């Protein structure tokens, strides 16, 4: 297989024209097979727009072709992800039945928990998932009710429930993390297998969208269950159970392996679960906590149980909306073809006085600003879009990084108190609704009294505030 880079065609071309260009690049040789690896827009000569491709193609006598071509042609090397253990084939695990107490338990069913359960189920380990929120079908109804009425369910909302916070977000699938194990492509292929559009495998900025992602998430859950896994919704982990480790060599070795997580003289023996107001013990030894960003009560519980934690920097700011067509004109030029994707941008600035960086983040083209609150009396927002990104506005976060030096104490959880402080302020100034302000008034530190040319695209109640 040969990888062809920087293959450029004008926007509006057909797939047949792309195929003909591959043949042209190969001096008339037809590929046995070919596939798109990457596709991006080149708008540097706007209004002339191009698609730039990376192609993997199989030819006869590839060695001769490679020797004749320039650096844009290389041997294609694709790393396929493989989960290292498989109970079914005996690689790395016993082929005997896993006892109940030794079954893998996963807390949370966002992206991390969902894929942990999927790979464990395929490997024959029959994982058990406990998710505090609802299945995605029921969760969607609850979230829509919240958007319309402002009545928050603290256990099932935009943050909590099957699929995690990303289910009601812009659905971005790109990462800057190096992928030497092939995990990124594995995740994308699984999404496609479960109903996502195939173009996410090669688009420079792959995106699914909330409308499609809900069905994809439900499909993955059904596969997990078909392979013997269990998923328990509306089941919250309230506490963990531990016991002191005795002096056997094996147990001391286990304690040494876990010393960066739990106190060295303790080991996990179970969980305290709550469902429908009733608490019960659940014995287990192997637990993955995939609880995401907003399960603050769980963070506090784990901290009290002496789980090792360190404070981390994060970002805070506002969402800014613009008419989507203005961003497309800015990025693509006037008279841009309709087929080009809804445009996005990136901005960054370094403040001279403080050295603090300000930058745009999580651009949401053709999407909505949504109320993403998960605690009563507090408010935060996020960007969300559907697959077609056809909303009349685009929005982005305009944020700055805060570090532990900005937090009110040196506690590992001081960052959570910092978040809560500003979420409470946002809730207060908007009377529980999303606070909205014209950007010019934001700069002047004054409340807006009427809309300008931009009508907000908001999921949830809103009102003017400063």
Regions found by a protein language model. Give the residues of each.
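Residues forming the flavin
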Residues: 1-51, 56-168, 172-251, 255-466
């Amino acid at each position: 297989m040969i990888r062809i880079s920087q293959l450029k065609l004008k926007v509006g071309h057909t797939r047949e024209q792309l195929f003909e260009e591959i043949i042209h690049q190969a001096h008339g040789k037809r590929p046995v097979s070919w596939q798109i690896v990457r596709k991006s827009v080149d708008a540097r000569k706007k209004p002339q727009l191009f698609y730039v491709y990376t192609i993997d193609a199989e030819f006869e006598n590839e060695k001769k072709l490679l020797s004749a071509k320039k650096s844009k042609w290389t041997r294609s090397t694709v790393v396929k992800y493989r989960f290292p253990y498989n109970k079914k084939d005996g690689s790395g695990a016993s082929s005997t039945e896993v006892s109940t107490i030794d079954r893998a338990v996963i807390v949370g069913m966002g992206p991390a928990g969902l894929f942990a359960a999927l790979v464990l189920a395929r490997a024959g380990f029959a994982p058990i998932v406990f998710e505090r929120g609802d299945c995605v079908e029921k969760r969607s109804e609850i979230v829509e009710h919240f958007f319309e009425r402002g009545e928050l369910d603290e256990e099932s909302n935009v943050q909590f429930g099957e699929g995690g916070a990303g289910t009601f977000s812009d659905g971005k699938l790109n990462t800057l993390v190096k992928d030497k194990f092939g995990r990124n492509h594995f995740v994308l292929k699984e999404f496609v297998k479960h109903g996502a559009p195939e173009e996410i495998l090669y688009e420079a900025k792959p995106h699914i969208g909330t409308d499609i992602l809900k069905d994809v998430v439900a499909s993955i859950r059904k596969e997990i269950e078909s392979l013997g896994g269990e998923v328990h919704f509306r089941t919250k982990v309230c506490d963990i159970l531990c016991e002191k480790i005795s002096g056997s060599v094996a147990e001391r070795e286990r304690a040494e392996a876990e010393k960066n997580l739990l106190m060295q003289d303790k080991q996990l023996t179970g969980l305290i679960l709550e469902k429908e107001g009733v608490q019960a013990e659940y014995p287990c030894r192997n637990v993955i906590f995939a609880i995401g960003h907003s399960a603050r009560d769980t963070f506090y519980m784990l901290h009290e149980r002496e789980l090792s934690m360190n404070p981390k920097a994060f970002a805070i700011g506002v969402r800014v909306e613009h008419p989507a067509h203005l961003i497309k004109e800015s990025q693509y030029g006037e008279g841009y073809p309709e087929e080009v994707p809804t445009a996005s941008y990136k901005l960054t600035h370094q403040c001279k006085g403080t050295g603090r960086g300000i930058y745009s983040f999580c651009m949401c083209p053709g999407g909505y600003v949504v109320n993403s609150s998960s605690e009563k009396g507090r408010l935060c927002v996020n960007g969300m879009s559907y697959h077609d990104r056809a909303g009349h506005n685009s929005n982005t976060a305009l944020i700055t990084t805060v570090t532990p030096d900005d937090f009110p104490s040196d506690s590992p959880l001081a960052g959570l108190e910092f978040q809560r402080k500003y979420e409470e302020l946002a809730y207060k100034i908007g009377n529980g609704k999303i606070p909205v302000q014209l950007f010019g008034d934001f700069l002047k530190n004054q409340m807006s009294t009427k809309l300008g040319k931009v009508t907000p695209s908001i999921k949830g109640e809103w009102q003017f505030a400063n």
